Every structure is written in structure tokens, then in C-alpha cells.
Amino acid sequence: MEGGRCAQVSSVPASPSSGHRHRAALILARGGSKGIPLKNIKNLAGVPLIGWVLRAALDSDVDSVWVSTDHDEIERVAKLWGAKVHRRSPEVSKDSSSSLETIQEFIRLRPEVDVICHIQATSPCLHPHHINEALQKITHQGFSYVLSVVRRHQFRWEELQENEDRNPKSFNINVAQRPRRQDWPGELYENGSFYFSTRKAWESGLTELGRIAYYEMPPEFSVDIDVDIDWPVAEQRVLRFGYFGREENAAVRLFLCKVSGCLTNGQIYMSVSGEDLVTINARDVAGIQMLQKENIEVILISSVNEPLSRGVLEKVSQRAGCGLSFTEQRNALEMQKLMDKRKLHWDQVAFMGSESEDVEIMSQAGLNGVPSDAPVAELIAAKYTCQRAGGHGAVREFAEYILSMKRKSSREENHERIDKHNF
């Protein structure tokens, strides 16, 4: 089984219900996080933390995806990523409120829901197949409760109080016969990615669970974020093992970049002689060159609606060392003409935009990105949101992201080519 293993851990009689059962994914995202303020919508590798699990849930076999929150900004981000929002009541929005209380409120208001897939927002390496395989334990095999676990090889010891004068006891190791890692299967621990259960189990307060199963996830997908120190580790892990959607981005052959607001900071300076002046960042130029070295063509795009004159735009493209497309309108139809000349498809195009009129192209491109200060970020869930602003290294940052996705896909292709039977 890809990515995980399922197992039964209890045998109370139960059987799958006949007919379709509404399966709802539910992510709890309260605004009052104590460890990292508003961590659920803080960007992790260019995507809001909650966006990683929403992307996986939306591409899975569940019937609906919900975010339960008490915060306006979390609600906005959740809707932007395609989720429905359950606005929780003040009674279940307190620091002392439990997840169980919040889920019970949700199912009281949603009588159509039969199976609740409680997914943790802090598990950014979750993939749709993890959700689907665990969900089948309930929908096809008659289990009532499924939790995600990870296998760890850790020896546990008893904790003593300071005033206790005795030796601590070992829980799972004989000190005189310490096994090698490869000789010990390890133990299963909850990894906190998800808890799936039938409506009846949640309504009972999890006191009547019926048949229980666990779903084992490999360690590389078992990432949890609780405090600041977890963030950089999770960022590196998600770039390699996170779920980036159904599209294949390794085939990017054309990068289209808007000039004003992306390559420049959107400001226009005027010389004493009345000439328009703009600045471009040397790091962005280096990023363009990085893509070109990987045989990715770079074209700056602009239109008659841009505040910059065509002469200035041509100088910018010359300095950046790439092509320029100057059109009557900046829309998907004009970009399609560029692609047709090169016999390319949208999934082979990466696009960087910044304004509301860029939404159409962003929604078509196989890979899209925005600077940190882009107004369009309020309108569409970008696949990558830069930490840097337009004209301040955002193009370089997005270029590095494009290349990292290409390397990631190459690793996966090489892994698939390995003959595991003769390895």
C-alpha cells in the first residue's frame, strides 16, 4: 500500500453501512494559538499552513471540506482555498475548549454528515492517498474509528520526581540486551495527522468507538508543528514530501513574469529631464538567468494599461536578459498566442502576477506565484506566495521554487525507475 499501512486494533462487531455516507473533512483552526500566533495561516514554503491540508483534502474522496474557526482572517483564507467554513460559537472558542466539543457542535448543525474526518492543520505533509486509504477502513471495512500513527525507535524511561531516590524503570528496553535498530520493530505513536470516526462515535463523546484501526504513515510524512523551532524543519520537509496538487510542474518550459509589481516595485521615478526611471533587483536578474540555464524561457509581459512606456519596458527586458511581450491586453487569450507559437500547454507555464487582472492567467498556469505585497493574493490562492516583495527579490525566490519543484519531480521519477525487487 502506497505511503502507509492499515491495521485493526480491536474487534467489536460492526459492518459497513449500505448506500453512500456523507464524508466531511473538518479542520479545526482557532485564532488564538498560543505557541505561534495565527500559525494556521502563516506561510510555510509559500503556502498558508492550513492550505497544505486543504489541498490534500480537496483532492481526496471526501464529499465536503470544512474549516471550523472563530477568526475572520482564517475564514477568508479557508474560503480562498476552496473550503466551506463553520463559524464556531463563543462556547467552543475558549482556551479551555476541546476538539471534541467543537466537533460535536459541528455535527449538531450538519445532520447530513455521517463520517467526520478530523484533520490537523499542523500536518502539512498529508497527501490525498493517506486520507483515502484511511477512509476506506470506515466506508468499506466496517471500522468506526481510525487514527494515524508513525513508527518510532525510541526507548522510554520512567520520569522521577526530584526527591525520589531510586533508579528509574525502563518501559520498553532491557538495558543488558539493548537491540540494534534493525532488529527491533519499534513502537507505534499517534502522529496527530488525523482522526476519522463515524458520527455515532463523536456523538458518544468517543466513549463508544466500536472497531478501531490505525493507519501507519511513514516518518517523512509525519510532520507536526507546535512551536517556532518546528517551523524551519517543517519547511524543508514539506518542500520534499508535501503535496503540491494534481498538476505536474516539472515540465515548466516557459516563465511569464509581469513587470510592474513583480520585477519592479511598482514605483516610477522621474529624472530632471522628464524621463521615467525604474529599478530592478540584481537578485531577480540572477533568478532569471538560473531559469534560462535550465532551458526555461523567460518572457516579461506587459500591456498598454501598464504605467511604463514601451521604451522603458524594452530597456528593462534588455537589462534582465529576457524577452518582452507587449500586448493590447494582459489576459489568457494573449498568453495562449505565446504558447501556440512554442507549441506549449498551460501546464508547462509558470506565471507571476500581482494585480486582480492577473487572476485569469494565474488560474490557467500550471504553476503560479505572487510577491508578498501583491493585491491579487486577496483574490486567489497562489501556489506560491513569496516572502519578498515585488522588486525586492520576489522573482529570484519564485525562480528558486520553480527549480526546486523540477528537482523534486526528477527525484520521484528516478525513484519510480528503481527495480525494488533487485535493488
From Swiss-Prot:
Location in or out of the cell: Cytoplasm
GO cellular component assignments: cytoplasm
GO molecular function, a single term: N-acylneuraminate cytidylyltransferase activity
Catalytic reaction list: an N-acylneuraminate + CTP = a CMP-N-acyl-beta-neuraminate + diphosphate
Keywords for the protein's UniProt record, in alphabetical order: Cytoplasm, Nucleotidyltransferase, Transferase
InterPro entries recorded: CMP-NeuNAc_synthase, Cytidylyl_trans, HAD-like_sf, HAD_sf, Nucleotide-diphossugar_trans
Pathway involvement of the protein, from the record: Amino-sugar metabolism; N-acetylneuraminate metabolism
Binding site for substrate: R30, N40, R88, S97, S99, Q120
Active-site residues, record numbering mapped to chain: R178
Enzyme Commission number(s) from the entry: 2.7.7.43
A single GO BP: N-acetylneuraminate metabolic process
Assembly: Homotetramer.
Record function comment: Catalyzes the activation of 2-keto-3-deoxy-D-glycero-D-galacto-nononic acid (KDN) to cytidine 5'-monophosphate 2-keto-3-deoxy-D-glycero-D-galacto-nononic acid (CMP-KDN), a substrate required for the addition of sialic acid. Also has weak activity towards N-acetylneuraminic acid (NeuNAc) and N-glycolylneuraminic acid (Neu5Gc).
Family statement drawn from the similarity comment of this UniProt entry: Belongs to the CMP-NeuNAc synthase family.
Name the record gives this protein: N-acylneuraminate cytidylyltransferase B
Organism encoding this protein: Danio rerio (Zebrafish)
Organism placement in taxonomy: Eukaryota, Metazoa, Chordata, Craniata, Vertebrata
